């Protein structure tokens, strides 16, 4: 297996999502790392956002979608089962959900951390203002905050250079 060879070569971080292959990606990864769970870091994402399709008009999501508490609690159980583990190292909101208050999402994620089902939380595909709003909300409500923010970045998609990358650089007297 490619995953076994990657681990032999020192790879220990694996990222997937409940939406990749409708959970099959998580199942394959779970089988591949079985017996080596303590040696790997598993990151997975939640939020089935079919209602936010680029092709059709967004509609009001059901409780089975998005970043609602109900959906998060259901999806984490599915991911744990698919992955064959009792905890997820990094659990990430796959997209910003405009229909669910960020407070609801963050409270649900905070509960998962306190339950031991998730070690850290993060986000993926959020704009800079959305990351800031989530971080501010976490601080104001004394909740676990995002430990990571995944963004699309490659030769064709360099949008993050304008809003997400600049704050990453630490101010230094040498930069002046």
Task: Give, region by region, the residue ranges found by the protein language model.
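Beta/alpha (TIM)-barrel catalytic core signal, keyed to glycine-rich beta->alpha loops juxtaposed to Asp/Glu
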Residues: 22, 97-176
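N-terminal small/glycine-rich loop or linker at the start of catalytic domains
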Residues: 43-63, 87, 92
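N-terminal binding-site loop/beta-alpha segment at the start of enzyme catalytic domains
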Residues: 1-44, 86, 174
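Acidic (Asp/Glu)-rich catalytic clusters
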Residues: 8, 30-41, 80-84, 113, ...
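Conserved beta-strand positions
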Residues: 16, 90-93, 123, 151
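Short, acidic/polar
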Residues: 1-6, 65-84, 131-136, 161
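Active-site mouth loops of central-metabolism enzymes
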Residues: 57-73, 94-100
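Active-site groove signature of glycoside hydrolases
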Residues: 80-101
């Amino acid at each position: 297996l490619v995953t076994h060879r990657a681990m032999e070569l020192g790879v220990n971080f694996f990222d997937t999502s409940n939406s990749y292959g409708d959970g099959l990606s998580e199942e394959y990864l779970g089988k591949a790392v079985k017996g080596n769970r303590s040696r790997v870091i598993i990151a997975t994402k939640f939020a089935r956002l079919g209602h936010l399709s680029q092709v059709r008009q967004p509609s009001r999501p059901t409780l089975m979608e998005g970043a609602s508490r109900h959906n998060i609690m259901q999806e984490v159980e599915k991911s744990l089962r698919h992955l064959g583990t009792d905890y997820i190292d990094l659990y990430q909101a796959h997209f910003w959900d405009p229909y669910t208050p960020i407070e609801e999402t963050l409270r649900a994620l905070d509960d998962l951390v306190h339950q031991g089902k998730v070690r850290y939380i993060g986000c993926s595909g959020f704009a800079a203002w959305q990351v800031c709003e989530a971080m501010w909300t976490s601080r104001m409500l004394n909740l676990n905050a995002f430990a990571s923010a995944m963004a699309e970045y490659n030769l064709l998609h360099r949008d993050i250079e304008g809003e997400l990358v600049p704050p990453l650089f630490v101010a230094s007297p040498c930069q002046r």
